[in-house]
Design a protein with these regions (language model features):
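Phosphate- and other anionic-substrate recognition elements at nucleic-acid/protein interfaces
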Residues: 2-7, 11-165
Length: 165
């Protein structure tokens, strides 16, 4: 059985979601980015092995116009560095507004214990959960597109170049 891993690549964290081809996509985990793509690939390999993943779906941050900017180029470069170390096919998916939608799904961040502003730990936990939810939205969009359904994002962005296993 094949499983898909959705990835929301951020500057500090990587949000993950998992799904069988029939869906639904479910938030899975968030981990801190490593100092280099090879460290990220190692962390992903553990998840891929545990979850029996056969394909990755990576969110591609586009401008509102649909054009690729510097963040999209950085994402593509990261995939080019990580994919040979993982050996799985990668599909790109438009990720515009996924973090905003994830925040709407999760609701506002909880206040601190004293009713004041949230603590640093609470902010970090909330951001990690947002990253997971964004990955789930990216992955669900891809699943919906593959099954002819309506998506919240844009059109599929194509596949990354495949490498020999």
């Amino acid at each position: 059985m094949s499983r898909l891993l959705g990835i929301d690549l951020g500057e500090k964290r990587i949000g993950l979601a998992i799904a069988d081809p029939g869906g639904p996509a479910m938030a899975l985990a968030t981990f801190r980015r490593g100092p280099a793509p090879a460290a990220d690939a190692e962390a992903l390999r553990r998840v891929i092995g545990e979850q029996a993943v056969t394909e990755l779906v990576v969110g591609l941050p586009l401008h509102a116009s649909g054009d690729e900017g510097s963040q999209a180029q950085l994402t593509r470069a990261w995939v080019e560095a990580v994919q040979p170390l993982i050996g799985l096919p990668v599909a790109f998916r438009d990720e515009r507004l996924t973090s905003h939608l994830a925040e709407q799904r999760l609701g506002p961040m909880k206040r601190g214990r004293s009713g004041g502003p949230p603590t640093r730990a609470q902010r970090e936990a909330y951001r990690a959960r947002v990253d997971q939810e964004a990955a789930a939205i990216i992955l669900q969009d891809e699943l919906d597109a593959r099954h002819g359904g309506v998506t919240t994002g844009g059109p599929p962005m194509g596949d990354a170049p495949e490498t020999a296993p």
